Amino acid sequence: MIKNFNVPILANDQVAENVFRLTLDAPELAETSHAGQFVQVKISDAFTLRRPLGIASTTNGYVKIFYRVVGRGTQVLSTRHAGTRLDVLGALGNGFTPRGGKILLVGGGMGLAPLLCAAETFSADVLLGGRNAGEVAFWCNEFKPHAEEIFVTTDDGSVGVYGFVTDALPDVLAKKNYSAVLTCGPEIMMRGVAKLALEKNLPCEVSFEKRMACGLGACLSCSIDTVDGRKKVCKDGPVFDARKVFA
């Protein structure tokens, strides 16, 4: 059930260049949310619109959220300190489908945040990509307690496989009998991941990152085309069957 929470900030730490990890003491939100869902955060009274942020972790009653400072709203959010309280609406949207077997998580950039929550929930390996060793280092540390095996690619080849996650994906898929592929990141990356997964007849779910205003399906600002017509990322997603959106 969607609720409005006013919760204390436990930490708001910078973990990489322009990337922050926000930790909230929110046991009820943690208990009722599912991997792949998101929240709408009210930055302050000075901002009319909330900011949609994916839920990255829900362990021990704490909700963790990763965000990149890209504008005035997230810049102000990065200045919020432990001990203050945050207005959060959630959990919103439809998350990943519960399933058994070994799942492969494939992500890049901030798209790795909702996949971290999936790694806490499912038995999973992760294939993660970034620009360089520094960008992927903190993600590897976050996934280590939850993922059985971590595969890495970097654009500059400084660590892991040189190239993109789609370059490494065929070899990773050949290593094990995965039951499904879950992916989140840039749309062009997800399209490539979905193509390779579906060629192997593997179920594939994609999680879209879209700008949105209301987060409740009223404003239509986050609508996308699917084989079933226009759908709202905030309400019908953000997780979709890849066959429905990349037909």
Whereabouts are the PLM-identified features?
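Short, basic/aromatic-enriched C-terminal tail that caps enzymatic domains
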Residues: M1-K3, R230-A247
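Ferredoxin-reductase
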Residues: I2-T84, R131
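Short, Lys/Arg- and Gly-enriched loop/turn segments at beta-strand edges
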Residues: F47-A56, G93-G101, C234
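FNR/FR-type flavoprotein reductase catalytic core
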Residues: Q75-F208
